[in-house]
Amino acid sequence: MRTLLGINEDDQSLIFAGDVPEGMTTQLMRANFDRLIDGAAKAAEQTQQDTPAEHHALSIAISCVGRKIILKERIDEEVEATLDVLPPNTQQVGFYSYGELSPTGSLSCRLHNQTMTLTLISESV
């Protein structure tokens, strides 16, 4: 998935975040606010599934700038959705990026757009 950054009307081309080889077929995504926010919560669920609730944790959140552009004033809901799911003693830092690197399931690490990528570091106290 690549974020559509713009349209070049002169040569009738699309400008994407990340490489899209010439001649490739693309599909356009239609954004849904609630599904984007729910997706962030699901990412948090996957991240914390092996972390006991009593552990202190640091969540590093990397969200695609495309999500910020789409969600606008609702962007805080994305962060809140992750913190609602993560263990209660979690502190979170993060930033917006133009591409997120993360494995998907058992696949190798790949470049993604339009994702919320979380890394959780925890320790028992």
Q: What spans do the regions from the language model cover?
A:
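Hydrophobic alpha/beta core scaffold segments
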Residues: 1-125
